[in-house]
Amino acid sequence: MSGFKADLNTKLGGNQWLKLNASFGHMLYPKINLAYNFRNSELDVYDMDNLVMNQRFLQHKFRVYLSENYSRTFCIGVGYEIENLTPMKVMYSLYDAVDSDYKGINTLGTFAYLHFDNLNKNRFPTRGVKGNIDFTWKDGTLSKKGIEKLHYGALTFGFEGYIPIVENRLVMIPQLYGSCLFGKGAVNGTTNGWNEMFKGPVPMYPSMNNLIGGAEMGRHIDQHLPFIGLNKISFAFNNVAIARLDIRTRLFKKHYLTAMFNYGRSSIDLNNFFKEKETLEWSEMYNYNASNWWGAGLRYSIDTKIGPLSLDISSSNISRKVNLYFNLGHFF
C-alpha cells in the first residue's frame, strides 16, 4: 500500500507491446504514477465485410497521473498524457483515392478513469460486477497539410455483470459496451478531406476511430469494442453502443458452454442514433442514421492451468458467414 513499486509487461511476436509503470504511494495521499506504453501493431481493417486497408503503426504514450491507494475494488485516476502515433505502412484496398502520405501526429491531453471489479474469481466468475469508464481529451498537431490542429475527446465504457441462476452451474452475464468520439478532429467530418467526403473514419490514425470486432475490449486501440459474430476488425461511426447477454453453464468440473447474443448500433451523431439506416456501409454518403448489428455464437471453454482454452462458433448480419475463433490463455 505504501512505498515505491515498478512493473514491466511485454508481448513479443506479432503486434508487440510494452507497458512500464512506476508508482509511489502512501496511505494518507494519492498514489503518484509514471507510465510508458509502446505498441507496434499491424492489422487489417474492414468496412463491415470489405477490406479497407492494411496498416502498421507505432504508438508511444507517456502518462503522469494520480490514483487512489486504498481500495481493492475501485480504481480511480486522473492525469496528463503525451502520445505519438506514426503510421508506418498504409495500404488501401477499397478507397484508393485517399492520400496515404501522412506523418506522425503528436497530442497532449488529459484523462480520467474509473474502474470497478468485485468479481468472486479471476477465471469463470459466478457473481459480481466489473466495469470501466475512461475519458480523454486531446490537443494535437500534424506536420502535414490536412489535419493541422486537433481538439477531440473520447468517452469509452464497459460493463459486465455475473448473476448466478443455479449456484456454480448456470450464470447469466449481461454486458454493455460503448464509445463516443467528439470534437474537432474526431471522425465527425470537421477537419480533413476524408472526413468531409465520407463523414466517417480517419483510417490512417486508428486512435481517432471507433473499432468493433473480436472478443476483447481495447485490444488494438482504447476505442476497440468486442462484437460476437465479427472476427474481423471493422470501422464504426462516432457513437457506438453494444448490448450483450451471455448464458454460461458448467458441463463438467472445468468444462463450460456459453450461448452469446449481442446487438449494436452506430451513428455519426447522437441525434441520429435512434433513426434507422437502410444499409450497413458507412461510405454511403448523406445517410447518417444508425446501423443495426446483431450477432450470436456458442463458446466451448476449458479451464486449464495456463488459462482458458476456448473455441467460438458465431455469425452476424455484418459478416453473413460462420466464424470460428480459437483462444488459449488470457489477453492482458
Locations of the language-model features?
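Flexible, surface-exposed loop regions and adjacent strand-edge segments
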Residues: 37-42, 83, 92-100, 148-152, ...
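Gram-negative/organellar outer-membrane beta-barrel architecture
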Residues: 1-111, 119, 123, 221, ...
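Membrane-embedded beta-strands of outer-membrane beta-barrel proteins
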Residues: 6-8, 22, 62-66, 112-114, ...
